Structure formats: C-alpha cells, structure tokens
Design a protein with these regions (language model features):
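Active-site catalytic microenvironments in core metabolic enzymes, especially phosphate/sugar-handling
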Residues: 1-238
C-alpha cells in the first residue's frame, strides 16, 4: 500500500479516485490531465496481481507501463481503508441508511453493524440494498422474517459471519460468498445478502474524494466515471 507507482517528488494538481486502477481508469486519468490516481485496491503486488514481470504483451504489464509512461503516480490502499473510521465499511453502512453504526465485535475490526429505522422483510431489504448500492443484482438467502439489526462488510468479508451471529444481527451484507456459506447460514440463524464486491466497496470512493477535496483544497479531485461494475446478471423472465 502507499505510493506504488510514480515519482514521489512530482507535482500534483489533479487527482482521480477509483476503486480499481483499470485500463479505462488510466485512460480517464490521462484524458483529464491528472497526475495521480488514488485507489482502494492495489494495482500491483497483491495476492491476485503478483508482479513477476512487467511486459508490454501482458495485460498487467501493459497497464503498469501505460501509467508510468504517462507520468502518472498511483497511491493505493486496501484493508487500511476498510478499517479506517469513515472508510469502506462506514461508507457502506451510511449508504444503506443504518442508524447508530458501530464496530462489529472487535472495536478495531473491519466490519460494522447498525439498525434500520423500521424493520422490513428480508426480500424488501434485499431490494433496498440493491437500489441503495446501485447493484445489478444481489444474491440472498434466509427466512422472510423481519430484518432490523444489520451487519455489513464491504468486499469479501464472509469470514465475519460468526461475528454477525454473535452480535445478534438479523442479516449480514457482504460479497463473494460461496454456495456452502449460503447453505450453512440457515442452520446458524443468520440471513445473508451478497451484494457484490464492487457495489459494497464503491461508496467509499465518493467519501474519499470529498475527504481529499477538504484536506487539499488546492487540488482538483474527481471520482472516476469510467470504472463500473463488470458483473452482469441474467434473470429468467426479464
């Protein structure tokens, strides 16, 4: 994490904020004459993007070389933004309209929990999650009883399911859940909603852009318009 690409001494006037640094995001930054991209997910040296070579004929190498040749720098975060006050999970709780949000279990842990102003059936809450996060669809499982106390974990936070149960939550909103996690949830007494990795983390980009504008008023800070959810859903009958 930190500055992963670029010149630490370079002057910065325009900043682009995005969840991921993709080819489209890099092209947008170049077109907007930005000097810096700030992202949540690292563009290199993480478990899903290990850097062994930087070659023009590989997708990752092509992206990294484009960034460097354009004079762009990249500052990337990850779990530090997940856990930070006002970070990924606080932004997710706010996007869902949770009241009295607080840590889920460990005071310094990643996930958050809060309550809905009024209880609602699971299906209605799943629809609310989908619309609030502007997701293309959500997966959910559990009985249709009322939902009031909600745990949230942006990104792949399925490992915190037991913490949500221990806290007495009615439902856990996260992403990247497996078939067996859904299957086992009923026996554990918890409802699950998988709203997707991008939709559960993307709300923080708006928060981060606003924070940077306030912290550095001399900079022009823009949230990426080109980075969108890549996963689509086909539902029979639609």
């Amino acid at each position: 994490v930190g500055q992963l690409l670029g010149d630490p001494e370079a002057e910065v006037r325009r900043v682009l904020v995005a969840l991921d640094i993709t080819e489209a995001v890099a092209d947008e930054a170049i077109a907007e004459n930005c000097q810096l991209i700030v992202s949540h997910h690292p563009v290199m040296n993480c478990k899903w993007l290990p850097v062994q070579t930087v070659r023009q004929d590989t997708p990752q190498g092509h992206l990294l070389l484009k960034i460097l040749r354009s004079g762009l720098s990249a500052i990337c975060m990850h779990t530090n933004l997940d856990v930070a006050p006002g970070g990924v999970n606080d932004a997710l709780a706010a996007a869902l309209g949770l009241e009295d949000p607080g840590p889920l279990g460990d005071p310094e842990g990643l996930c958050r929990m809060g309550t809905l102003a009024s209880p609602m059936p699971l299906q209605e809450f799943a629809k609310h999650v989908c619309r609030a996060l502007q997701a293309n669809g959500v997966r959910y499982a559990g009985d249709s009883g009322p939902v009031r106390k909600v745990a949230v974990g942006g990104g792949a936070c399925g490992d915190y399911e037991d913490a949500a149960i221990a806290a007495g939550c009615d439902v856990f909103v996260t992403s990247d859940l497996s078939y067996h996690q859904f299957l086992d949830a009923a026996g554990k007494g918890i409802r699950l909603i998988d709203a997707g990795h991008f939709p559960t983390e993307n709300p923080v980009c708006t928060v981060l852009a606003e924070y940077l504008r306030g912290r550095f008023p001399g900079l022009t800070v823009t949230k990426s318009a080109s980075h969108r959810e890549v996963i689509q859903y086909y539902v029979e009958g639609e």
